[in-house]
């Protein structure tokens, strides 16, 4: 192996709450353990709640292969019609909301079910599945953070793990 991808960053680290310091130390140990096996590239992301967000887990390619797919309008649909979040106009333009509404009208029940599964169920190999109420509760933990706060928390995380990464 040359790369380890998607080592989860716990939400408490992203929020800098509760036991985040212990979790960062655990992450440092993970980095050191991976490096001890001559793997020097580790990929991760810092998204709230889920490790990856995709809106379709089985997008058919022209070659008949399957791929993961992300559709921004479907995320708006997910927030608007599945999570039933308020104040979407603070995150999305009127045009985006209107386009999402149009797309939603074209979706069948199975399309909505698959969208919900893709976003809340994670990748096919993932064992983590959330109910709508669990997902909303976890998302609510981020309600007081804006993009600047999240970026600052990411900077702090990187500042703490970089010495271990550079040493190994």
Task: Label each region the model flagged.
Residues 3-6, 44-46:
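A cross-domain feature marking catalytic cores of carbohydrate-active enzymes
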Residues 11-168:
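Active-site acidic/histidine proton-transfer and metal-coordination neighborhood
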């Amino acid at each position: 192996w040359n790369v380890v991808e998607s080592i989860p960053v716990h939400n408490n680290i992203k929020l800098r709450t509760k036991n985040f310091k212990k979790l960062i130390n655990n992450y440092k140990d993970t980095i050191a353990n991976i490096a001890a096996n001559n793997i020097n590239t580790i990929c991760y992301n810092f998204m709230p709640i889920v490790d990856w967000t995709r809106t379709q887990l089985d997008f058919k390619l022209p070659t008949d292969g399957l791929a993961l797919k992300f559709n921004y309008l479907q995320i708006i649909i997910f927030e608007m019609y599945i999570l039933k979040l308020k104040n979407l106009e603070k995150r999305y333009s009127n045009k985006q909301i209107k386009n999402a509404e149009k797309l939603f009208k074209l979706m069948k029940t199975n399309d909505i079910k698959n969208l919900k599964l893709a976003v809340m169920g994670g990748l096919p190999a993932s064992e983590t599945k959330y109910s709508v109420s669990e997902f909303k509760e976890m998302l609510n933990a981020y309600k007081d953070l804006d993009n600047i706060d999240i970026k600052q928390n990411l900077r702090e995380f990187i500042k703490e793990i970089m010495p271990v990464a550079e040493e190994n």
